Regions:
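Folded, non-transmembrane soluble domains that reside on the lumenal/extracytoplasmic side of membranes
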Residues: 1-141
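C-terminal single-pass membrane-anchor helix
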Residues: 131-167
């Protein structure tokens, strides 16, 4: 992750823990700073089990395996967070489709998006306000507006080319 993202995660995690008692950790492997090769699913599961034994519930851990191109979101207790919903609705759409797209900026954006949504869900559950977190509704609205503008631009370009070719 880029340095700004690391600082953001540390600040929000600290505030979340102080207000709710829930630890939120992002664990990234296969990098120079954490060179652990975990190619098979069994290796990743064993690594996760060992990592999770070090934490006391309640906690949420976001595992990111760069080389295997896998992500795992784990909550303990399991009903603490709807991890599947967050993964499939907020993280999966941002997953890179090829190896060239696995840049530090793209990885940071993907992880921060999922992290921020998960923190918002935890804050709502515990009825607290996490002041250092992104305001999710504004971010979602902004992304939707940008996507609509891009779609309308593409549609306009397509229709313009279609009608000018016929003339």
């Amino acid at each position: 992750m880029v340095e700004k993202s690391v600082a953001f995660v540390e600040g929000v995690s600290k505030e979340l823990y102080l207000k709710t008692g829930v630890r939120f950790v992002i664990d990234m492997t296969d990098f120079e700073k954490n060179p652990i090769a975990l190619a098979t699913k069994n290796e990743r599961q064993n690594y996760q089990e060992g990592f999770l034994k070090q934490l006391k519930p309640p906690f949420v851990v976001f595992f990111f395996y760069h080389d295997a191109q896998k992500i795992e979101l784990v909550a303990n207790p399991k009903d603490l967070l709807d991890t599947d919903k967050i993964f499939f609705e907020k993280i999966a759409p941002l997953l890179p489709t090829n190896a060239k797209e696995y840049t530090p900026q793209r990885i940071s954006a993907m992880l921060i998006n999922g992290y921020s949504v998960a923190v918002d869900a935890l804050a709502q559950k515990y009825r607290v306000n996490i002041t250092q977190n992104f305001n999710a509704p504004k971010g979602v609205t902004f992304v939707k507006v940008v996507i609509y503008i891009l779609l309308l631009t593409l549609l306009g370009a397509f229709l313009g080319l279609y009608f000018f070719k016929k003339s």
